[in-house]
């Protein structure tokens, strides 16, 4: 599914926990729909049976490699079930995390960056990937009183390693970095500007 034809736009927001991804993703979808576009919010990892089984029945076997392959399969099904049909129907799909989350988190857990990238080599490439950069202390402070699906990833030293991998991916030109330590409205304006610029280049 690495190269398909579609008339929509695939937008991904990445960042450590507490960077504001979910809030800004939903703000963006609401705004785009208000402007007359067709926009849809989605997220990864999904709530598929695959992820839940590995986190449950097979949790004792989890490591960076098992997680990377689990999330890659979850991603493929997510693409086939939801993302690609929406893109072909002309939607702007805004995904709260995608394959670069797997690269960052599984590399921070011990898998080589390039191996995780290779595992995801044939995943559909986003049209726009925005990394919301915030220091781990700020991110985890924001998440302090919020429920989380993956508490094992919310440890300060681990969050620092995750951020280092994200910054390496930015350096490789795979993502656009936006300072997310500012008020949410300021961060959102910058994100919206990037997406509207990308939309202006989509053939009509």
What are these regions (language model features)?
Residues 35-121:
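ATP-dependent small-molecule kinase phosphotransfer cores
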Residues 6-10:
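Pre-Walker A (Motif I) flank of P-loop NTPase domains
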Residues 2-4, 29, 137-204:
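NTP-dependent small-molecule kinase module
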Residues 22:
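Walker A/P-loop
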Residues 13:
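Hydrophobic anchor at the beta1->P-loop junction of P-loop NTPases
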Residues 102-164:
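A glycine- and Lys/Arg-enriched "phosphate-lid" helix/loop adjacent to the NTP-binding pocket
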Residues 18-19:
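ATP-binding Walker
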């Amino acid at each position: 599914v690495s190269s398909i034809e579609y008339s929509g736009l695939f937008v991904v927001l990445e960042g450590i926990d507490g960077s504001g991804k979910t809030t800004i993703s939903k703000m963006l979808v609401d705004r785009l729909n208000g402007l007359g576009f067709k926009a849809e919010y989605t997220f990864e990892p999904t709530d598929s049976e695959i992820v839940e089984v590995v986190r449950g029945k097979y949790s004792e076997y989890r490591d960076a490699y098992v997680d990377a392959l689990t999330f890659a399969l979850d991603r493929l099904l997510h693409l086939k079930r939801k993302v690609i049909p929406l893109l072909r129907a002309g939607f702007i799909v805004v995904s709260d995390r995608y394959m670069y989350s797997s690269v960052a988190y599984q590399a921070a857990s011990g898998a080589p960056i390039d191996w995780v990238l290779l595992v995801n080599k044939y995943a559909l490439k986003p049209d726009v990937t925005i990394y919301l950069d915030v220091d781990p202390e700020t991110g985890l402070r924001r998440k302090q009183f919020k429920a989380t699906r993956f508490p094992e990833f919310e440890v300060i030293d681990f969050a620092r390693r995750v951020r280092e991998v994200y910054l390496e991916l930015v350096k490789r030109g795979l993502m656009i970095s936006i300072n997310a330590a500012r008020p949410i409205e300021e961060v959102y304006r910058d994100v919206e500007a990037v997406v509207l610029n990308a939309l202006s280049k989509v053939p009509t």
